[in-house]
């Protein structure tokens, strides 16, 4: 989660888009209080990770008083992986269980829709592979319940069994970066198709999206040139930081081009279809219902720390809510978002060190 400074020109666009989105209203989405129900002594993130929420809110208030966008720089960019507290990503399974990829004592925490903790793991050495929670960035759950966890700074992805006590597969080479069939450079997002094929956004070091089969065999990639660190572009199938992605019922892929301020749409074989512009937004994650058949997505937008409900047909924002802050319904680095089969939305705050659930 590397923060990119927003230029004054884009800041104007952000404010314009924010005003437009605000006119749409919140779509009737309301915060569910006290979700999830963390057991006594449990917490998300690093217990003593600075700066504390009150300090961040004071920084944001000072920026607002100066007429500067609080969301653009209210939270300082971390110097390294161990200084990023909180929740790096969310995933959801076929039973609507919410998987929290947590940079803390329990790297993976699983909750039911009522907010009860039902499983936790990833906090030990598994099959000789040390899992480091401070390196996490995102994850996914396949249709058999296996869990995929991106350890970004180790340049690898590990597949765990449903009980989270066995490593089944590794993609990438531990601590070795690259842009070929067996290496990543700071991978950022992942999705798994019904046939087990795996799509990875290899976005912080490289600029490519990669398709693997269920065994981890490289099939193809989509990128400008070789998809390396210098291979940025704004054309179809090119990227300026591919970040995260989601899949609908037809297994259409909606992939965030974070610094390109757009979604790129592909079929399940990574054939390009179209683009959905999200100008005025800094999209970090996208959530589509596990059923994936209602034609809408939810965007975690870091520009002004909001959630947008977006029509996948025409790209129009139909609802929006949130702002920079640590109060109810506010966000501080909203970096993960998922939607359950009943339409409830779950949004994760990295620096807020919490998850918020919204229903209507």
Question: What are these regions, as identified by a protein language model?
Answer:
Residues 112-116, 161-164, 213-217, 267-271, ...:
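Short loop/turn segments that connect beta-strands within beta-propeller blades
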Residues 332-360:
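Blade-level signature of beta-propeller repeat domains, shared across WD40, Kelch, NHL, RCC1
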């Amino acid at each position: 989660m590397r923060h990119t400074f927003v230029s004054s020109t884009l800041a104007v666009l952000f404010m314009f888009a924010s005003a437009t989105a605000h006119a749409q209203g919140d779509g009737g989405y309301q915060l569910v209080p006290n979700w999830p129900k963390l057991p006594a002594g449990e917490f998300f993130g690093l217990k003593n990770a600075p700066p504390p929420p009150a300090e961040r809110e004071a920084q944001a208030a000072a920026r607002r008083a100066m007429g500067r966008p609080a969301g653009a720089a209210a939270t300082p960019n971390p110097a390294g992986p161990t200084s990023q507290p909180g929740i790096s990503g969310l995933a959801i399974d076929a039973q609507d269980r919410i998987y929290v990829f947590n940079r803390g004592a329990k790297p993976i925490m699983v909750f039911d829709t009522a907010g009860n903790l039902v499983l936790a793991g990833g906090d030990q050495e598994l099959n000789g592979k040390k899992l480091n929670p401070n390196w996490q960035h995102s994850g996914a759950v396949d249709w058999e319940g296996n869990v995929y966890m991106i350890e970004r700074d180790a340049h690898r992805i590990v597949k765990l069994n449903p009980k989270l006590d066995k490593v089944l597969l590794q993609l990438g080479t531990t601590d070795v970066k690259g842009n070929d069939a067996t290496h990543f450079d700071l991978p950022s997002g992942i999705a798994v198709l019904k046939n087990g094929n795996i799509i990875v956004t290899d976005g912080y070091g490289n600029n490519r999206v990669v398709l693997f089969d269920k065994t981890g065999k490289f099939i193809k990639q989509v990128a400008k040139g070789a998809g390396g660190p210098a291979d940025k572009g704004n054309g179809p199938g090119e990227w300026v930081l591919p970040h995260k992605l989601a899949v609908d019922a037809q297994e259409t892929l909606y992939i965030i081009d974070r610094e390109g301020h757009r979604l790129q749409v592909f079929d399940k074989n990574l054939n390009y279809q179209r683009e959905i512009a999200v100008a005025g937004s800094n999209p970090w994650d996208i959530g589509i219902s596990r059923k994936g058949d209602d034609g809408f997505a939810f965007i975690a937008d870091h520009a002004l720390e909001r959630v947008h409900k977006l029509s996948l047909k025409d790209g129009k924002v139909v609802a929006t809510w949130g702002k920079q802050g640590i109060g109810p319904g506010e966000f501080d680095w909203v970096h993960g978002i998922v939607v359950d089969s009943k339409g409830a939305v779950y949004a994760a705050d990295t620096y807020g060190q919490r998850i918020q659930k919204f229903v209507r």
